[in-house]
Amino acid sequence: SWRLEKGEHGKPFYQDAPWLHFSISHSGTFWVCAVSGQPLGVDLQERRRKGKAAAKNESDNLGRIAARFFHPAEAQYFSSMTQDGSRAWETAFYDIWAAKESYVKYSGEGIGKTFGEFSVSDGKGLCFEVNPSFGPPAMLRFLELEPGYSLCVCAERIEEVRVFDLGLP
């Protein structure tokens, strides 16, 4: 049997299988697990759709969260998405959040590391590489799981991502 341990910041690993790396996330009705021979992180976020009347309030609430936790470039990108009257701001917010969470899971820093210390956006869109001053560089891969969800995998290098739907009840 393999013993599950936790790293300094809570990242789980198998003591008896140091070559096996995994990351898990769940949101809404989905659960995801990423497995690799290299360190990685995965995060899933359900975008919580509300009616049109609540959309402005929701945009304002997410804007306050972005101002507090996002890097200035990410906050700029999010803000630019709120200007056109569409709901692009919703996808932008949750894509940024999923990317940031997947990075801190990959790096092993956990969410205790201030999200504002690194950016997954250049201010105009999302980036596919992260180069923070405090941790290892990484690649990001955004995946389509289901409409209404943001899913991001992060690792030092990403050559291929295979998705298996286990279809469990």
Regions found by a protein language model. Give the residues of each.
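Core catalytic alpha/beta fold that binds nucleotide/phospho-ligands
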Residues: 1-169
